[in-house]
Amino acid sequence: MLDVKILRTQFEEVKEKLMQRGGDLTNIDRFEQLDKDRRRLIAEVEELKSKRNDVSQQIAVLKREKKDAEPLIAQMREVGDRIKRMDEQIRQLEAELDDLLLSIPNVPHESVPIGQSEEDNVEVRRWGEPRSFSFEPKPHWEIADRLGLLDFERAAKVAGSRFVFYKGLGARLERALINFMLDIHLDEFGYEEVLPPYLVNRASMIGTGQLPKFAEDAFHLDSEDYFLIPTAEVPVTNLHRDEILAADDLPIYYAAYSACFRAEAGSAGRDTRGLIRQHQFNKVELVKFVKPEDSYDELEKLTRQAETILQRLGLPYRVVALCTGDLGFSAAKTYDIEVWLPSYGTYREISSCSNFEAFQARRANIRFRRDPKAKPEYVHTLNGSGLAIGRTVAAILENYQQEDGSVIVPEALRPYMGNRDVIR
C-alpha cells in the first residue's frame, strides 16, 4: 500500500510513475477525487462544529437572561443532524478510499527499466553455456514418463488437469532438491527455517498484496474464509504482521519450503504439458525483513543466493530486470532468474526476486524502532524463490538427459540421492 501522505502531496509525480506500468489508472484518479470530497466535507463539518460552539454560547447567554432561546436551539438541532449525516458520508468515503488504496500498485523504483511488456525486460547477466546435444533433446515430461518419474495421467484422474504424481526416483529427486536448497540457504546464507501453514486468512492475503486484485487466481475455502497459499511469501511475511520489531533484530531472513496452490485463471492453453504451470507445486521461498536503507543491497544478495542453487546444479541461466510494464503489483523492483530448457529452446522463469520496499509492510503493519524511544518506521520486505522445485526438476531432466533416455544426477545432488549418479 502506498503512503497516503505522499499520494496526497505528490499526486502527479506518483501518477506519472504509475503510468509507466501501463494499465488502468481509474482507481488513482478516483482516489484523488474522493479524497478531495472527504477533505471538503471535513472542512464543512469543522465549520459547522465551530458555528455550533458559538451559538451554544449565545444560547447560554439567552438562558441566563431568561430570554427565548428556542429558535437557536432548533437551529442547532438541525446543524447537529447535518453533522451526523456528513460524518456518515466521511466514514463511507474513508472506507472507499481504503479499498482504493489496496487496489493501487507499488511505484516502480527509479532503476527499473521503462517498458510495456516482457519484451522490454533487460538482461543483466548470464551464467553457463546451453549444452549442445548430439541428438534431439526431449521435453521433460517425455523423459519422466519413460523413466517412471512422473504420472500426469493418473493425477488428472484423481484431481484434474495441471496436477502430477511424483513416483519412485522422481519423488526422491523432488525431496532431494528441497533439502539441498534449504541446506544451502540455512547453512551458508544464514536463513532461519520456517514451515508455514498452507491455509491463511483474508488479512494475510491482503497484507502481501494478493487481495483484492488477484482473488480469481486464489483457491478459496468459502465455508471458513481461508485461502490456500499461492506461495510461502504470504504466511511468512505475515509472521510479523501488526508487530514492532527492534532495529537489532534486523535483518531477518526466513527460508520456507511449502506446497503452493494457484488457480492459473489467466493461463488457459499455456504450458498445458509438463511441470511448468501446475495448480499445486513445491517451492523454497526466501523472505527478508530489513531496514529501508539496506533493502536494495539485500535484493542483490537475495538474487545471488537464488543463483547459487543453479550454479551448484550446473544449470545455465540468465538474470533479467523486469521492466515497469511487467512488474508485479506489489514490487518496486524485480529480477527474474530464467533457467535454460533445451526442449523449449529458451530460458524460462525459475525464480522471481523482489523488493517491495514498505508496500507490504504498510498493508500488514510491520514496523521497527531504531531505538526504544524512536517513532516506529515501516520495514522493507523482500522475497524470492530459492527455487521453484518442479521447474528445477524439469531443468535437470532436460539439461542432463542422455541419448539412451537416462538422466545424469548433478554431482552436488548425489549425496541427497543415495549417491546415485544416474537415473535410468
Curated annotation (Swiss-Prot):
Source superkingdom: Bacteria
Q: Which family does it belong to?
A: Belongs to the class-II aminoacyl-tRNA synthetase family. Type-1 seryl-tRNA synthetase subfamily.
Subcellular compartments? Cytoplasm
Which gene name does the record give?
Answer: serS
State any single GO MF term.
catalytic activity, acting on a protein
Name the species this protein comes from. Answer: Geobacillus kaustophilus (strain HTA426)
Listed under subunit, the entry gives: Homodimer. The tRNA molecule binds across the dimer.
Q: Does the keyword Thylakoid apply?
A: no
Quote the entry's note on domains.
Consists of two distinct domains, a catalytic core and a N-terminal extension that is involved in tRNA binding.
HAMAP family from the UniProt entry: Ser_tRNA_synth_type1
What protein is this chain from? Serine--tRNA ligase
Q: What is the lineage of its organism?
A: Bacteria, Bacillati, Bacillota, Bacilli, Bacillales
Tell me which EC number(s) this protein carries: 6.1.1.11
Its GO biological process annotations read: selenocysteine biosynthetic process; seryl-tRNA aminoacylation
Gene Ontology, cellular component aspect:
cytoplasm
